[in-house]
Amino acid sequence: MTDVAIIAGVLLAGGVAAGLSRRREYVLRWCAWAVGVPVVLAALRAGPGGAAVLAGAAGVACALEYGGLTRLPWVDRAVLTVAVPMVPVTAWVAPAQLPQVLILALVAVALVPVLAGDATGGLSRLCFGMLGVIWFAPLAGVVLLGPAVLALFAAVSIADITASFGGRLLGGPSLSPLSPAKHWSGLLAGTVAGLGTLAVLGAFTPALAIAVAAGAPLGDLLESMVKRGVKAKDSASWLAGAGGLLDRLDSLLLSLLIALVLGH
């Protein structure tokens, strides 16, 4: 059975589970995945170029959502929206130049408030801008990880939804003050489901296992910290039942970074 067939089966099973839960949130979230998963599969099937386009488009969406979330001025958002997708595109066309492009992206967003002479909010703009570049740079992993990225995407997605459902069902101690609604029980359930997905897809390696077990929950908490800092519930509201794209990719971003660092 191919990876695509397995993922299609999991998506179908998820739809049944979402329907049985009778929770509007899970049904809407499944609908979003039902639309998004075929797009992801098609892009990754197209090879490195398709992966770069997918990652670049995701980077643009995340940068726009993040700019609105942190209330960056429009000029900062524009520079960030150009800088972020350049990282995965460079990973495709000139991977050896990736460090230089990443440095240029950081310098570009840092210079905006400096050149604007912002004496009151400049430091905040600089910090938020540089955080955005660093946070979204792991999207280069969609290109660099090759076929492994599909298994990582599936495992993190399943771990994320299982953690949410398991935490609500089992309850118990809260995971972190950053996200009081999340529970340790959900973390354990999500980790088991994510690692099981890697095993089923034949992609269970130490690097990917750590990326799923540690990167997924920590990535979720990182976004929770940012949202709490700016007093927001979701990164956006355009994605039915799921807030924004960043709310769905937060776990994947840190997982991609860990997989890249550990050399999947």
Role assignments for model-derived ranges:
Residues 260-264:
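Juxtamembrane boundary at the C-terminal end of a transmembrane helix
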